[in-house]
């Protein structure tokens, strides 16, 4: 193999590799000798088919395989010989006029990782803003839960049902006098004014009393989930078995038991733990941003454009998805377009910090164990259809690049935790509002034109309580796609395992493609589609 360097500018490298026709032909001959003993052909004893016939039968296929393997091996040898550290998958091209019997000229272009010296971590100083959880906060949360879990008691038989009252009803629905599937229910609870049943249903039950029977007529929405009912007029025979009125909920052991807890103390313990988890997430976000800011301030080395492009694309795609869900998508899209350069700066910052964290981790022996990687892979596999999970796990095992991308966020967290342990940390007690304001203030500081804009942190999402805890106030934050809390160390890309024989590229073979993620589940039809929206 002949090697010629054609580009050496900054982090960009390019080479021309020449595989002589003689080399290629010799490898094809070796492949023929290897497979000849297994070839069967009428008129010849097993294993005795002449090499020239084997080559005639399978030569084209062997040639393609030899070219693929030769390109792969040549690129691997180049990277090893030149001691290159590819930032991303090298771009590999085979000359378009190549044909069997001629030299193969392969163009290889790539960006390399910059040389980054791991900084000293001896003088790191961090402030940890802590938020204590008071008994009052715990009870406020429980009271919100109680407000969301309303209780009802039987009303007097003379009471006429009004908005906010709960009805216990039996109903039977029909279209043109014929009952339809799902149009019948017994002891169905319905809170008037809740809007849970199709338009017109609840309104016609206002004023009914316990024991009343009534036939109501409604029209199903044109976009109703059951196509056989969409847009059709239906009649419902309704029997009101009980009118109930809302009553105050007593917060006691019985209330906790209704929520699946042993007693009220256990409920308080659960809520306190969740509130602490929320605030601990915010504390970590603020502390991590302070750490990253310190690291970013002292380092401004060049980063590979390809890595920045890939990071920016990820940020941009998420921002566009979020904008599309806003009340005014066009306005939201214009807003992010106006800040496009800022988001690219965020992407560059992420890549730079990622490379820096990676070097710090390697210099200090931070590693991800095989057990941790296995658990990470199994967790990631859960987002795929059950039949695709095994294939996804095999894909991760076989593709170093995919494994590196999956490993990166966990590795970052381990490096950050390592730095937290090494830093001199002082605690300061603040309110939740002060902590959120501190995070937002850092974001506002980054908006100044003189500074590169970075991503503000996003509040950690609390786990949902079994008791349907009311959501806490959201921390003032910018788009999730650009939060510093998601800084990811750059995954070091592996060279392509195989290069296609024609116009080689970095695309993976089809069998190694990651399985498609399972689609979002379609909303299941309600058990009683006749009466529900």
From Swiss-Prot:
Residue ranges, compositional bias (Basic and acidic residues): 481-490
Enzyme Commission code(s) on record: 5.2.1.8
A GO molecular-function annotation: protein folding chaperone
InterPro entries: PPIase_dom_sf (IPR046357), PPIase_FKBP_dom (IPR001179), Trig_fac (IPR005215), Trigger_fac_C (IPR008880), Trigger_fac_C_sf (IPR037041), Trigger_fac_ribosome-bd_bac (IPR008881), Trigger_fac_ribosome-bd_sf (IPR036611), Trigger_fact/SurA_dom_sf (IPR027304)
GO cellular component, one term: cytoplasm
Catalytic activity: [protein]-peptidylproline (omega=180) = [protein]-peptidylproline (omega=0)
Region of interest: Disordered: 436-533
Cell cycle keyword on record: yes
Major enzyme class: isomerase
Keyword list, A-Z: Cell cycle, Cell division, Chaperone, Cytoplasm, Isomerase, Rotamase
Subcellular location: Cytoplasm
Record's keyword annotation contains Chaperone: yes
Pfam families on file: FKBP_C (PF00254), Trigger_C (PF05698), Trigger_N (PF05697)
Main location: cytoplasm
Function: Involved in protein export. Acts as a chaperone by maintaining the newly synthesized protein in an open conformation. Functions as a peptidyl-prolyl cis-trans isomerase.
UniProt-listed NCBIfam families: tig
Protein family membership: Belongs to the FKBP-type PPIase family. Tig subfamily.
HAMAP family (alphabetical): Trigger_factor_Tig (MF_00303)
Comment field on protein domains: Consists of 3 domains; the N-terminus binds the ribosome, the middle domain has PPIase activity, while the C-terminus has intrinsic chaperone activity on its own.
The protein's name in its UniProt record: Trigger factor
Organism field: Erythrobacter litoralis (strain HTCC2594)
